[in-house]
């Protein structure tokens, strides 16, 4: 499995803490730096949307959360090239642990997808904030 995220992958997030995109923006999800992160505003649900330059088959998602600010219920959905705004392809639902180390969530390889949306329906934070230091999507 290889990383599907590259310079041409567009990423959108539902919110950024205090609109401070420099310190907490989406670019920090994939910059490889251990001290930078994406931090959402309070409120649920939150989401991360990945728009790939071409169709991909996803087989796992890698996260590193900040303990205490973990998306404790994550729903992953996808859309095809023919209908990029129709997120009707259910990929998986997983429940990350409230810990700091990297966690990998594997599932059956998906059909060819144009976009993948990760929805955080619940958070370990009372206010619904999510903090992610690392995100990777693996597959073909």
Pin down the residues of each PLM region.
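Disordered, acidic Ser/Thr/Pro-rich linker "stalks" and the adjacent N-terminal cap
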Residues: 1-53, 66
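Activation corresponds to long, low-complexity, non-globular regions
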Residues: 1-2, 133, 140
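Hydrophobic/aromatic beta-strand segments within beta-rich folds
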Residues: 33, 47-52, 58-64, 103-137
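Sterically constrained small-residue positions within well-ordered secondary structures
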Residues: 39-41, 67, 96-98, 109, ...
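Short coil-to-beta-strand transition motifs
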Residues: 54-55, 70
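Residue-level signal for short segments within beta-strands and strand-turn junctions
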Residues: 65, 78-80, 139
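Short, surface-exposed beta-strand/strand-loop-strand elements in extracellular ectodomains
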Residues: 70-84
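Extracellular carbohydrate recognition and processing domains
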Residues: 86-108
């Amino acid at each position: 499995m290889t990383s599907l995220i590259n310079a041409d992958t567009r990423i959108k997030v539902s919110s950024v803490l205090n609109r401070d995109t420099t310190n907490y923006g989406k670019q920090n999800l994939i910059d490889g730096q251990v001290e930078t992160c994406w931090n959402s505003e309070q409120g649920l649900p939150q989401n991360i949307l990945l728009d790939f330059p071409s169709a991909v088959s996803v087989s796992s998602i890698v996260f590193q959360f900040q303990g205490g600010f973990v998306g404790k219920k994550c729903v992953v959905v996808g859309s095809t090239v023919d209908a990029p705004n129709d997120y009707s392809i259910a990929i998986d639902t997983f429940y990350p642990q409230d810990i700091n180390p990297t966690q990998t969530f594997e599932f059956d390889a998906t059909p060819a997808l144009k976009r993948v949306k990760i929805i955080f329906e619940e958070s370990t934070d009372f206010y619904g904030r999510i903090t992610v230091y690392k995100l990777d999507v693996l597959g073909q």
